[in-house]
Amino acid sequence: MFSRLHSPKRKTVPIMSIFLLVHGAWHNGRCWERVVPLLESAGHRVFTPSLTGYGDKAHLLSPEVGLDTHVEDVVRLIHEEDLTEVVLVGHSYAGLVISSVANEVPERIAHLVYLDAMVPEHGETAVDVQPMTQNLIDLAARSDSAWRVPPLPEMPPPFGLFGVTDPADVAWLRAMVSDQPVRCLQQPVRLDNPAVNVIPRTHIHCVGVEPEGITRRPVPAIQPNGSPARVWELPTGHDCMITMPTELSELLLK
């Protein structure tokens, strides 16, 4: 069912779920700070790791860091914490990450949520899913540090910084973001495990402002597991966890 939803009333998430929220490119685990207490107050466990090269792991940034590194980060956390029945949420670039994670440990994943995210097929890279990504790689290649892409610049309203326009929020976000390794955008997704197909999926699209050049693949009406697609929309910019944390949390709990 395709819907625009602002205040869902029925909660269908189990009494206690495990949410694993994976940030996108340039960000780190702190971007979920406004969402975490809302999910925890509803009785759920929440994990918001920073991937290698970001946040508390920024010192590990190197040319060798790639998509596979980030997949290993999440799989390792799942095993170390012995997590099962995980609601795995991937924002933006992390749509690639959660796809490969599900491919490795499908038995531990209860639900996949693609949050304004790249939705790949097996063997695809970020460039395949979002062609404008190649422009960022080319730009990096002409710099002194060809192996990494600096954070995107703030754009004039209504686009702002990743869809964030409030000055205080922009300043907070600007202090958080860091360079993105090019290898993350070039390594292919592994999505060839048939067991992944049975995992239900939800897609949440941020439709408030969409800069030119950004494309979104249509979501098939039927999920791989045969059930109707679940697609929700939020009338805000890309970083909805910052601009609409309450509404996002309501969707995650639905």
Where are these regions (language model features)?
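Active-site loop/oxyanion-hole signature of alpha/beta-hydrolase fold enzymes
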Residues: 45, 51-87, 103-104, 126-131
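Conserved HGGG/HGGXW glycine-rich cap/lid loop of the alpha/beta-hydrolase fold
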Residues: 17-58
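Post-His helix in hydrolase/transferase enzymes
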Residues: 242-254
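Gly/Ala-rich beta-loop-alpha elbow adjacent to hydrolase catalytic centers
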Residues: 90, 94, 98
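Active-site nucleophile elbow and catalytic-triad environment of alpha/beta-hydrolase enzymes
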Residues: 175-194
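Flexible "cap/lid" loop of the alpha/beta hydrolase fold
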Residues: 103, 108-109, 113-154, 184-185, ...
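Conserved loop-alpha-helix segment in the C-terminal half of the alpha/beta-hydrolase fold
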Residues: 207-235, 239-242
